[in-house]
Amino acid sequence: MKTEDMALVFSKLILNPITKRQILNLFKKDDNGNLIIENYIDAYMKGEDINSLGYKTLKSVLDNGLKTFAGEIYKENFKDFLKDPLFKKGLISVVRGLGYFGVKRPFVSGAPFLVVWDVTYACNLRCKHCYANAGKPLEDELNTEEALKTIDILANSGVVAIAFSGGEPLMRKDLFELIDRAKDYNMQVSIASNGTMLNKTNAKKLKEHKVDFVQISLDGTKETHEKFRGIKGIYDKTIEGIKNVVDEDIFCAIATTATKLNYRDVPKVMDLAEELNVNYFMLYNYIPVGVGDYDIDLSPEEREELLNLLWEKLNNDTGKKYRTAFLSTAPYYSRTALEHNKYYLASHFANVDLGENERLKSLANFIGGCGCGRFYLSLRANGDIQPCVFFPLKLGNIKSFKDENDFLEFWRNNKILNDLRDRDKLKICGSCMYKYVCGGCRARAYSYYDDYLREDPGCILTKNLK
């Protein structure tokens, strides 16, 4: 049976009212306050059998999902993956998403996998492209009590990962208290920093508090970076910060936002990323928002040149055993891979090579493209909720939610989020053959046209679709 036909059968299984009801019942709590699904996944992992309709439903969903999208060969590996608490959290969110939304293209998780939270707008730099217009903290930024409650709500909703950003998050005095609260819930915690405050002491402290991932911004050579960031003398501090994080063996990424001011420097930064032995080089898709001007945005041709360069670097078989992976937040990066006859889920979460497995390849249509409103949300420092940090459209405020039930109700039913999840609603990108693996950047559409369903003007294909 073809994968598309198997996916249809799987979808019918999920849409069965009895199946759907049993899936949602898995998210009730037992007498110990644990989700029933957590107990059942533990039993599934151990190969145990439980005589209950809920367990049999979960087992059927997992077995049929694996068969449809991976094949039986992956079943035993899958059980090994379940030993990882983060993988287990992610799976629980997937199952909840099936109960809420069914087998959608693109897929929507039961709660955001990732929330990017600008915990403060205090910053020691003056970057020319800052989406947050950072510098001084807002007067109404969440206090410690409000921030801790926010983490409780997100964690209890099933959010897997939280990224503390800004501003410069290290300028928030209670940051490590917030990190500890998130780690108490076994959440993945990352920090997005400009690197200038990452001295040996702070890098060691991040390690001690079990931060999983640190992303540091670097936008070019010394001259370019300091011009871009608005302060002379900070390039060396940034490089030192990167080295300190790598020395602490924390997963480290260099993030470069490509504009007309620095895109010729990008290959040099990519080479430097390898020399510094970081795990990721992340090419950020520039979006004119905050203090960022439209006139420094790349043309579609310049952006295409960079994405192809990134792809070549990722697949360069020179015999060198660098560990650096090359990623981009541009949703068209997956389309770049397909144009090179490769099935790759290329995103700002990870690069996933789907290889030659036809069933795995079909996943690209379900989980590829922009995750905005499907896999992640953003929070401003005052608790305002946005689809993405580059997408300044207020959807609500976290302080208005009493608990995780209110948050999950918002996640399920917010009109704008549901618009973003429906690629058939896209006015130009919706007619593109790559709409499921890409779909364009909704933040760029909103920035340019004040309409998040319009085309992404940064994509080289849009001129042929009008």
Swiss-Prot record:
* Keywords associated with the record: 4Fe-4S, Iron, Iron-sulfur, Lipid metabolism, Metal-binding, Oxidoreductase, S-adenosyl-L-methionine
Q: How is the cofactor bound?
A: Binds 3 [4Fe-4S] clusters. The first cluster is coordinated with 3 cysteines and an exchangeable S-adenosyl-L-methionine.
Instruction: Please name one Pfam family that this protein belongs to.
Output: SPASM
Q: Which SMART domains match?
A: Elp3 (SM00729)
Radical SAM core domain segment(s): 100-317
In terms of CDD domains, this protein maps to:
Radical_SAM, SPASM_MftC-like
What residues bind S-adenosyl-L-methionine, as annotated?
Answer: 167, 217, 229
SUPFAM superfamilies referenced in this protein's UniProt entry, alphabetically: Radical SAM enzymes
Q: Please provide, alphabetically and separated by semicolons, the GO molecular function terms listed in this UniProt record.
A: 4 iron, 4 sulfur cluster binding; metal ion binding; oxidoreductase activity
Report the Gene3D superfamilies cross-referenced here: Aldolase class I (3.20.20.70)
Provide the cofactor list for this protein: [4Fe-4S] cluster
So where does [4Fe-4S] cluster 2 get bound?
Answer: 370, 372, 388, 441
Residues binding [4Fe-4S] cluster 1 are: 123, 127, 130
Q: Which InterPro entries match?
A: 4Fe4S-binding_SPASM_dom (IPR023885), Aldolase_TIM (IPR013785), Elp3/MiaA/NifB-like_rSAM (IPR006638), Radical_SAM_PqqE_MftC-like (IPR050377), rSAM (IPR007197), Sulphatase_maturase_rSAM (IPR023867)
Where [4Fe-4S] cluster 3 is bound, by residue?
Answer: 429, 432, 438, 459
Top-level enzyme category: oxidoreductase
Biological process per Gene Ontology, one example term: heme biosynthetic process
Q: What is its EC number?
A: 1.-.-.-
Q: Pathway it belongs to?
A: Membrane lipid metabolism
Reaction(s) catalysed by this chain's protein: GDGT-0 + AH2 + 2 S-adenosyl-L-methionine = GMGT-0 + 2 5'-deoxyadenosine + 2 L-methionine + A + 2 H(+)
The UniProt family comment states:
Belongs to the radical SAM superfamily.
* Main function: SAM-dependent enzyme that synthesizes glycerol monoalkyl glycerol tetraethers (GMGTs), which are thought to contribute to increased cell membrane rigidity at high temperature. Catalyzes the formation of a C(sp(3))-C(sp(3)) linkage between the two isoprenoid chains of glycerol dialkyl glycerol tetraethers (GDGTs), leading to the formation of GMGTs.
The UniProt comment on domains reads: Contains four domains, including an N-terminal domain comprised of six helices, a conserved radical SAM domain (RS-domain), a bridging region with two helices and a beta-hairpin motif, and a C-terminal SPASM domain.
Any miscellaneous information on file? The analysis of metagenomes from both oceans and lakes suggests that GMGTs producers are widespread in a variety of oxygen-deficient environments but absent in oxic environments.
Please report the name of this protein according to its UniProt entry: GMGT synthase
Organism name:
Methanothermococcus okinawensis (strain DSM 14208 / JCM 11175 / IH1)
Primary gene name: gms
